[in-house]
Structure formats: structure tokens, C-alpha cells
Amino acid sequence: MSRTPWKSQPCEMVQPSGGPAGDQDVLGEESSLGKPTMLHLPSEQGAPETFQRCLEENQELRDAIRQSNQMLRERCEELQRFQGSQREEKEFLMQKFCEARRLVERLSLEKLELRRQREQALQEVELLKTCQQQMAEDKASVKAQVTSLLGELQESQSRLEAATKERQALESRVRATSEQVRQLENEREALQQQHSVQVDQLRLQSQSMEAALRMERQAASEEKRKLAQLQVAYHQLFQEYDNHIKSSVVSSERNRGLQLEDLKQQLQQAEEALVAKQEVIDKLKEEAEQHKIVMETVPVLKAQADIYKADFQAERQAREQLAERKELLQEQLEQLQREYSRLKTSCQESARIEDMRKRHVEVSQPTLPPAPAHHSFHPALPSQRRSPPEEPPNFCCPKCQYQAPDMDTLQIHVMECIE
């Protein structure tokens, strides 16, 4: 740090009032150091009064010179003390100026860090938007799979109805066959001796017919069992989906909550830095006001004060820009929160559809066995076994257990319930 040159104030020497020119030639002068000079006497001797007066004036001159030297020394010491105090004040001001500059640099770094964090948050928003688009596409594919699943369910229901109708037809044929068997039994009682061989053949045919009937009943029972398993799988699918949605929502909210807490903490740190900076600036401003009178006497310090004032104005503008930046970041934070809420809702919907699609794929892997071949048979011997009573079809929603009157109503309700 270069030292500021000081201009010493001129100190005027006290000049004693001298006598006439002839007296100055007679008496000698004393220098500023107080050394007496040779006294030159004229060739002619003066009166005693004149000599006495010259001695008195010489003594007065010496006293005046001594007083002038003493005042000059005091002035010099005072000037040195003043220069030392001014130098200390200058060093103090330069130290404060360096501290303010370091504070400005630190705030600039914090500003760059906040800008980087904002860019990172924008990148995360873009990534979430991309995920949302992907989930929308997955949602469309899942809807298509649900539609195909409902078509398969309707097809299996149609097959079950066809099997039920075939079973009813078989039971009708069995009843007709039973009537014929009773008639043959009456004839057998009359013609037992004559048609023993035919009776044995008819008995064999009756046994084969009973076996075919048992196979048909087993096939119908298997169809009912598969339908019940499909309904249970649907119910379990939606229960697992609800559990998965709850766990995913809790984890997503926890992660977003941590990110929001980090952003709020960063904003609070920025506010505290701005408050501390304002306090430092106010303190420096008060100190500048206190030293304003002294700085007016020193041109170099005045120029430095002008530079400091310009830096202060720049600092104020930077503080205002930081305040505007803070408001902008607050608005962006609120916008990100709204975007997060919207994306969270979309993610929940997409996760629900994705989980349902996975469950549908797992459930739809075991294919339904083909319907058993219907064996044609001829009337045979009577049978004592009767078929169990027919069970009505159960059109039940696997999610809310809604009982539908028919298959079309169930299909419409399942689509609405899933959406």
C-alpha cells in the first residue's frame, strides 16, 4: 500500500521589528539555530543610550527567534502525529475496503452456486417431464392390455356359458336316455332269457355314457374353478397395487421433502448472508461519515473515498440484484412445488397402471385349456346318478366386489373402476 504524500502547512517565522538600517549594521543577527553572529561596531562610538537600546533589541530578537523555533518544533511534532493518525486511519479504511471486496466475491460465488442449483432443478424438471411422457405411453399400452384382458374374460365367460348349455343338453339327453332305459328295463324283464347278450352290450354302453358324463361334469367344474381363480387373482392384484402405491408415494414424498428442505435451507443461508452484508455496509457507511471531515483535507483519501463510494453503489446494486434473484428463486421454487405435485399425481397414476399391467401379465401367462371334446353316444342302460344343480354365473368386479347383472355391464364397470 503506497503512502500518501502529505503537504506540510507553511509555518511563518516571527520577525521582530528591527531598528533603522544603521542599527542593523551595528548589531548582528541570530540564526534559526540560535547561534549569535559577530557584532560589528561602527568606527565611531555611539552614545550609551543607543548602545543600551541596541542590546535590548538584540535580546528581544533572540527571544523572538527562540519562541519561533519552539513553535516550529511543536508544529512539526503535531504534523507528525497528524500524519501518523491519518496513516492509521487510511490503513483501517483499506482493510475495511478489502473485507468488503472479499464479501462481494463470496456473494458472487454464492450467486453462481444458486444459479447452478437452479439449472440442476430445471434439468430434474425436464427429466420428470420425460418420465411423465413415458408413463403416458405406458398407460395407453396398459389400457390396451386391460381391454384385451376383459375380452379374454368375456371369451372365457362365453365358453363357460357354452359349456353350461352343453351340459344342459347332455342332461336332457341323459333324461331321455333314462326314459329309454326304463322302457328297455321293462322289455328286459319280459325278454331277459332271449336277449342276455344284448343286455350285456347295453350295460357296457351305459357305463361308457356315464364315464363321458363324468368327464363333461369335470370339465364344467374345471371351468368354474378357473373363473374363480381369475377373480381371486384380480382381487389380489388390486390389493398389491394399493400397497405398492402407498409405499411409492411415501418414498417419493420423502425424497421431494428432503429436496425442498435443502432449497429452503439454501434460501435461508442466502438471506442471512444478505443481512450480514447489510450490517457490514451500514457500519462502513457510519465510519465513512465519521471520517468524512478528515478525508476532505486529504485529496488522495478523497479520491479513494470516491472509489469506495462507487464500490458501495455497486454493492447496493448487487444487493438489489440478489434480492430480485431471491424473489425469482422463490417463485421458481413455488413453481417447482406445483410441478412436483402435478408430476407426483401423474406418477401415482402411471405406477398404478404399470403395476396392474405387470399383474395382468403374470395372471395371463397360464393359458386356459381347450374345451374337452364332446363324445357322441347312443342311448344305453339307465343310470342312477343325477347331475348337481346348475350354479348361476358370478359377474363380480375384482376390485370393489360389485355384482353386475351381465357381462357387458361388468366390462363397463371394470373400465370405469380402473380409471
Curated annotation (Swiss-Prot):
Which region ranges are annotated with the description Ubiquitin-binding (UBAN)? 242-350
Q: How is it modified after translation?
A: Phosphorylation at Ser-68 attenuates aminoterminal homodimerization.
Start and end residues, zinc fingers (CCHC NOA-type): 389-419
Report the leader peptide range.
none
The record's GO CC annotations read: cytoplasm; IkappaB kinase complex; nucleus
Q: Where is this region: Interaction with TANK?
A: 150-257
**Where is it localised?**
Cytoplasm; Nucleus
Q: Where is this cross-link: Glycyl lysine isopeptide (Lys-Gly) (interchain with G-Cter in ubiquitin)?
A: 111, 139, 143, 226, 246, 264, 277, 283, 285, 292, 302, 309, 326, 399
Which residue intervals make up region (Self-association)? Answer: 246-365
Q: Where is this cross-link: Glycyl lysine isopeptide (Lys-Gly) (interchain with G-Cter in SUMO)?
A: 277, 309
| Molecular function (Gene Ontology), one example | zinc ion binding
Instruction: Report the coiled-coil segments.
Output: 100-353
From the UniProt entry, list the residue stretches annotated as the region Disordered.
1-46, 363-394
| Domain of life of the source | Eukaryota
Q: Where is this region: Required for interaction with and ubiquitination by MARCHF2?
A: 1-197
Positions carrying Phosphoserine: 31, 43, 68, 85, 376, 387
Q: Where is this region: Leucine-zipper?
A: 322-343
| Entry protein name | NF-kappa-B essential modulator
Organism per entry: Sus scrofa (Pig)
